[in-house]
């Protein structure tokens, strides 16, 4: 999993509330179990005007020239609602999204996202609206995020956010669940050995 310490990238506003996991990655694309290859299907029904994904919907912000190569999304409340499919953060990460800023996230999506290296940042609704409005007006769409400081830097504004220490450390060190387990392999083996001795 890629470390997240400081990231600066183009931010794309998605002015929708309750974006669900079926909108993020529709069910017909959930056939693979690898994390790769889902990015091209991200927001399929919004990004394309045909099922063959051959014609882009140019009214959708991610397809617009100024938001090409976006690595940050700014959206509205309850992002990631719906089913618990882990393919949703896989698709976002595979597309190149490193962080999502919103007033709130569905709990299961949030945990899945953080576990896959995708930072979820909760700001107030007013703060999100302020960022969205400025993104739409400004030529410079770049936002800087410091997970070390737990701050978002945009123009001359600084927005503070919170994240629990466990997920923050995992993201800073680039540790997914498997890597985290391997990091503590020696302690786990020692615990298992002591437990077996006790049972005997």
UniProtKB/Swiss-Prot annotation:
The enzyme's E.C. designation: 4.2.1.33
Reaction(s) catalysed by this chain's protein: (2R,3S)-3-isopropylmalate = (2S)-2-isopropylmalate
Record keywords: Amino-acid biosynthesis, Branched-chain amino acid biosynthesis, Leucine biosynthesis, Lyase
Top enzyme category: lyase
UniProt-listed GO biological process terms: L-leucine biosynthetic process
Record PANTHER family: 3-ISOPROPYLMALATE DEHYDRATASE SMALL SUBUNIT (PTHR43345:SF5), 3-ISOPROPYLMALATE DEHYDRATASE SMALL SUBUNIT 2-RELATED-RELATED (PTHR43345)
Oligomeric form and interacting partners: Heterodimer of LeuC and LeuD.
Family statement: Belongs to the LeuD family. LeuD type 1 subfamily.
Function: Catalyzes the isomerization between 2-isopropylmalate and 3-isopropylmalate, via the formation of 2-isopropylmaleate.
Name this polypeptide is given: 3-isopropylmalate dehydratase small subunit
Source organism: Campylobacter jejuni subsp. doylei (strain ATCC BAA-1458 / RM4099 / 269.97)
Gene: leuD
